[in-house]
Amino acid sequence: KAMQDEGVTETFLVPTMIKRLIEHPRFKDFSFPKLATMMYGAAPIDATLLAQSMTAFPGTQFGQAYGMTELAPTVCILAAADHLPGPHQAQRLRSAGRSVSIAEVAIQDSDGNELPTGQVGEIVARGPMVMRGYWNKPAETAQALRNGWMHTGDGGYMDADGYVYVVDRIKDMIVSGGENVYSCEVENAIALHPDVSLSAVIGVPDERWGERVHAVVMLRPDATLDEATLIEHCRIHIAGYKIPRSVEFRAELPLSPAGKLQKFVLREPFWAHMERRVN
């Protein structure tokens, strides 16, 4: 209502905010003729939600910003032009965009070596916008700022045109039977089911596989989806080793004040009795 009444022209929302906005029962009672630009970011957005959002706001240009507070805060932009129909649209919409003019972005391995196009490593950035350090936290500063680069903690890769693709938070990656499973990919598959409102995929201890893929799912109102049906749905969209081995349904998922999923809250009960948070 405030966006309509105040004639908001630009806004920045995290995906959870967009989802709750367009799914609100009274959303269609309002119009936003002056809303020229909607930027989104701070958390991954699945393809289904992005398509629904662009349909819900047909006269609005969309753009994605990628970065972190330590980078003041944006280092990559997926421009409005990248959201327009074209031969590369589907691929580009999976990316976080290309680096802004004052930032240099690269993909590095754990030893700080730059990786070739298409290979997954850690997203790092440098430039005049990088922080000097964390206040009175020299150890954390030394860990984040190494060899002149700010280490984001995000795993990703870069294509030949310089578009950066975020695959997961490095700490959220699941290693099951020696295979790397990126939780975002599983969440995107789950999001394709019409009964799902929101999901979080985490790794939980497993005696056989080390870790197994576990999905925590929030359903839409009046939905009756069960575990077996959702697992079979995932089997259509992703490889067998990425499919959730267990599904837990909840009425709400833990979110930060900024609307980000707090996966550490979901993981804690499963790992509390373990000596290490990897298995």
Predicted feature residues:
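AMP-binding/adenylate-forming catalytic core of the ANL superfamily
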Residues: 3-4, 11-14, 24, 122, ...
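Gly/Ser/Thr-rich phosphate-binding loop
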Residues: 5-13, 22-91, 104, 111-114
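Active-site glycine-centered loops adjacent to acidic/histidine catalytic or metal-binding residues
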Residues: 42, 67, 97, 154, ...
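Adenylate-forming AMP-binding core of the ANL superfamily, especially NRPS adenylation
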Residues: 44, 84-136, 144, 161
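Beta-strand->loop->alpha-helix junctions that form or flank phosphate-binding loops
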Residues: 63-70, 97, 202-204, 248
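Active-site and channel-lining beta-strand-loop segments
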Residues: 104-110, 251-258
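Acidic/polar alpha-helix N-cap and adjacent early helical turns
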Residues: 268-279
